[in-house]
């Protein structure tokens, strides 16, 4: 592809705005600001130990998880980049206990931005792919946001995406009209369209789950994974491979490109806590992307994007990816009426 004919993210969004009339100018500008923030995060991630940002920060987030220095830095980059643009009423982050209203000295917009600033941060110090996940909602109360303003089901998302900071830095986006992938051209500093209308194969021979938790799984998950592991000699009559990176953005990006199912189920260790992944910051945006690419996403008992949130940091079980596999494991939950 010649440099002159490359489609940048800005050009792509402007063309979408003209062609579909469902991408308002303020939403387009918001997406561009988020993408610029992801470039800044990518730069800091790539510096590694040279940037003195590796290691823990000596603090915990609202989830009770030890924060990495890059967790805090990435959160600050996203807040600073988006607070003054006039497109947002408020923001919410996995790293903050409560939401962040746009300061009174800045103009306010009609959107809400929800994000996990650095997903997979346990991998930071060992140089494994990590990323940023985000979701955009309309503020139902106009420009005056409350915590309740954020508590909308995933079906209300107007945009969602993620960036992966790996061998290449990529930015994957949906605004409800398919899924497209942009790669960061570091020489010119632009996001360039490299994959259009991405589609997840309906069938797969790969699955992603943390198998070290197998003894804690509920029966539907145990049954499903046992069938996969039985290979050609089992009821599936085919061999399956397990892939687990412990970085949701990296695992989902692989599935988006070549198929597979990602599973993070609830388990018996914490029966009062339905899963580990956050509905607002991880499950909803990834489900929007996966469904737009022809896949499926459920909690095992219902479509993730139809879950009515009850809190900013609500957790849910997650099964997403190739449609036929997600439907199979979901049917096992229905048969067993289990988690």
UniProtKB/Swiss-Prot annotation:
Predominant location category: cytoplasm
Record carries keyword S-adenosyl-L-methionine: no
Comment on bound cofactor: Binds 2 magnesium ions per subunit.
Residues the record lists as binding Mg(2+) 2: 116, 119, 282
Cofactor (UniProt): Mg(2+)
Binding-site residues for Mg(2+) 1, renumbered to this chain: 94, 116, 118
Binding residues for substrate: 119-122, 210, 276
Record's keyword annotation contains Magnesium: yes
One annotated GO molecular function: magnesium ion binding
Pfam families, alphabetized: FBPase, FBPase_C
Subcellular location field: Cytoplasm
Gene Ontology biological process terms, A to Z: fructose 1,6-bisphosphate metabolic process; fructose 6-phosphate metabolic process; fructose metabolic process; gluconeogenesis; sucrose biosynthetic process
Gene3D superfamilies hit by this protein: 3.40.190.80, Fructose-1,6-Bisphosphatase, subunit A, domain 1
Catalyzed reaction equations: beta-D-fructose 1,6-bisphosphate + H2O = beta-D-fructose 6-phosphate + phosphate
Domain of life: Bacteria
Keywords linked to the UniProt accession: Carbohydrate metabolism, Cytoplasm, Hydrolase, Magnesium, Metal-binding
Cellular component GO terms held in the UniProt record: cytosol
Pathway: Carbohydrate biosynthesis; gluconeogenesis
Self-association and partners: Homotetramer.
Stated family: Belongs to the FBPase class 1 family.
Name of protein: Fructose-1,6-bisphosphatase class 1
Native species: Burkholderia ambifaria (strain MC40-6)
Species lineage: Bacteria, Pseudomonadati, Pseudomonadota, Betaproteobacteria, Burkholderiales
The encoding gene: fbp
């Amino acid at each position: 592809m010649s440099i002159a004919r490359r489609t940048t993210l800005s050009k792509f969004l402007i063309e979408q705005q003209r062609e579909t009339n469902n991408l308002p100018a303020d939403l387009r500008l918001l997406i561009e600001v988020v993408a610029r923030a992801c470039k800044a995060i990518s730069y800091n991630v790539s510096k590694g130990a040279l940037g003195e940002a590796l290691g823990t920060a000596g603090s915990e987030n609202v989830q009770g998880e030890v924060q990495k220095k890059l967790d805090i830095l990435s959160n600050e980059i996203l807040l600073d980049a988006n607070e003054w643009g006039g497109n947002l009423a408020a923001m919410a982050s996995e790293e903050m206990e409560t939401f962040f209203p746009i300061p009174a000295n800045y103009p306010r917009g009609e959107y809400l931005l929800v994000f996990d600033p650095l997903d997979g941060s346990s991998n930071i110090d060992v140089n494994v792919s990590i990323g940023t996940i985000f979701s955009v909602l309309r503020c139902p109360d106009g420009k005056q946001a409350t915590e309740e303003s954020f508590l909308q089901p995933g079906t209300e998302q107007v945009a969602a995406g993620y960036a992966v900071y790996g061998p290449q830095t990529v930015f994957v986006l949906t605004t409800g009209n398919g899924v497209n992938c942009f790669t960061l051209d570091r020489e010119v500093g632009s996001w360039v369209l490299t994959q259009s209308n991405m589609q997840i194969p309906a069938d797969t021979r790969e699955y992603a789950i943390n198998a070290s938790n197998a003894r804690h799984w509920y029966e539907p998950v145990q049954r499903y994974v046992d069938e996969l592991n039985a290979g050609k000699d089992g009821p599936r009559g085919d061999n399956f491979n397990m892939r687990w990176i412990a970085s949701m953005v990296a695992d989902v990006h692989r599935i988006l490109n070549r198929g597979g199912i990602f599973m993070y189920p609830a388990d018996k260790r914490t029966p009062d806590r339905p899963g580990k992944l956050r509905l607002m910051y991880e499950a909803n945006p990834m489900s929007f992307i996966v469904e737009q690419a022809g896949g499926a996403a459920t909690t095992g008992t219902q479509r993730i994007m139809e879950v009515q949130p009850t809190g900013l940091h609500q957790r849910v079980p997650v099964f997403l990816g190739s449609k036929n596999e997600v439907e199979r494991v979901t049917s096992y939950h229905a048969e067993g009426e289990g988690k």
